[in-house]
């Protein structure tokens, strides 16, 4: 049996923060504003997994009003979704993600992000797609958005 889920997240940029994408840290002078570390890619992946399982969402599991989640590493969120997934005897077949932003240049860090996700998700790099899209002027806000689709398969 297969299940498919979609996850989405968006954050504004904030100067002076480190940027976290896919569990990797980039010190480029700005990061993503958020209650946690702001890793929009991991947030979207987490929600895609939870959605495929027809379970709760990241905001319910880890409320942004909770002091416990302040500056929390988004890998914790992903690990909880993976725990739920494994408990239900599912595994990830593949992941397809779009990062929509005018900055940073995703093509220069894509391989590093895919390597990180491969390690975190325990799936081959060939099963992970990270695509960069620009906003084409439709939104002048200084932000980054991610949309991910996760395909899961029941383990035999």
From Swiss-Prot:
It comes from the Bacteria. GO terms for molecular function: 2-C-methyl-D-erythritol 2,4-cyclodiphosphate synthase activity; metal ion binding. The keyword Disulfide bond does not apply. InterPro entries: MECDP_synthase, MECDP_synthase_CS, MECDP_synthase_sf. One of its GO terms (biological process) is terpenoid biosynthetic process. Binds 1 divalent metal cation per subunit. Pathway: Isoprenoid biosynthesis; isopentenyl diphosphate biosynthesis via DXP pathway; isopentenyl diphosphate from 1-deoxy-D-xylulose 5-phosphate: step 4/6. A divalent metal cation binds at residues 9, 11, 43. The keyword Flavoprotein does not apply. Its EC number is 4.6.1.12. HAMAP family: IspF. Belongs to the IspF family. Involved in the biosynthesis of isopentenyl diphosphate (IPP) and dimethylallyl diphosphate (DMAPP), two major building blocks of isoprenoid compounds. Catalyzes the conversion of 4-diphosphocytidyl-2-C-methyl-D-erythritol 2-phosphate (CDP-ME2P) to 2-C-methyl-D-erythritol 2,4-cyclodiphosphate (ME-CPP) with a corresponding release of cytidine 5-monophosphate (CMP). Homotrimer. This is 2-C-methyl-D-erythritol 2,4-cyclodiphosphate synthase.
């Amino acid at each position: 049996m297969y299940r498919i889920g979609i996850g989405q997240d968006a954050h504004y940029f904030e100067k002076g923060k480190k940027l976290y994408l896919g569990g990797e840290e980039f010190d480029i002078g700005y990061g993503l504003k958020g209650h946690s570390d702001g890793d929009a890619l991991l947030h979207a992946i987490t929600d895609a997994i939870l959605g495929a399982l027809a379970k709760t969402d990241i905001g319910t599991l880890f409320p942004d009003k909770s002091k416990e989640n302040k500056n929390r590493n988004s890998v914790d969120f992903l690990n909880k979704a993976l725990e739920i997934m494994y408990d239900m005897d599912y595994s990830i077949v593949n992941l397809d993600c779009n990062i929509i932003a005018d900055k940073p240049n995703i093509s220069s860090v894509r391989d590093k992000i895919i390597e990180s996700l491969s390690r975190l998700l325990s799936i081959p790099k060939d099963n992970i797609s990270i695509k960069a899209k620009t906003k084409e002027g439709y939104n002048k806000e200084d932000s980054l958005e991610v949309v991910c689709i996760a395909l899961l398969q029941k383990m035999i």
